[in-house]
């Protein structure tokens, strides 16, 4: 789900917008907390860059980052989910994939297949912004008042693959599961 969230958000952005500051809302952190989701660690009121937000969606699988990116690019969660499902149709996978939220929270109306996830990942890797995020081994956010040293995110999966098989064998990835 979060790869599609990244893709839909990134398609509404450009490289110049990556440095733009976004304030983390209480709604974003509450959504993450109430749904017992993984979080990037952004705090209410924290001013982060769009690039920080996008990396926060993927590397630590941050629900608050996904929520905030959805609101930032589409205005409401409902509109963002509509945008996600329009992208599903564009990719030709609407028979077996449908999204009901930008985070991947379990819902019978939020479903996909492994094959469709590969289609989504392929589309994301064709987007320059997405490719940069999905292929990052490590990323440190910009310094903020709440995190003076920034927050360092690491792709445990890509780093493990690099250690075992050598760098460059896998160029982009996102792990995830639903209980």
Protein language model features and the residues they cover:
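Domain-terminus/edge residues, biased toward the C-terminal soluble/receptor-binding domains
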Residues: 94-95, 106-179
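Active-site-adjacent loops and short helices of periplasmic peptidoglycan-processing enzymes
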Residues: 1-115, 124-128
């Amino acid at each position: 789900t979060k790869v599609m969230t990244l893709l839909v958000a990134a398609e509404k952005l450009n490289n110049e917008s990556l440095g733009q500051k976004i304030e983390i809302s209480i709604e974003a952190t509450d959504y993450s907390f109430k749904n017992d989701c993984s979080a990037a660690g952004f705090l209410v009121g924290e001013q982060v860059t769009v690039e920080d937000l996008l990396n926060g969606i993927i590397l630590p699988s941050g629900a608050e980052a996904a929520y905030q990116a959805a609101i930032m690019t589409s205005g409401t969660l409902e509109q963002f989910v509509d945008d996600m499902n329009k992208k599903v149709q564009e990719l030709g996978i609407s028979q077996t994939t449908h999204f009901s939220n930008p985070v991947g929270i379990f819902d019978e109306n939020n479903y996909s297949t492994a094959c469709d996830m590969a289609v989504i990942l392929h589309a994301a890797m064709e987007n320059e912004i997405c490719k940069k995020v999905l292929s990052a081994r490590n990323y440190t956010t910009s310094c903020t008042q709440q995190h003076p040293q920034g927050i360092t995110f690491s792709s445990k999966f890509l780093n493990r693959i690099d250690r075992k098989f050598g760098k460059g064998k896998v160029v982009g990835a996102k792990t995830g599961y639903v209980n």
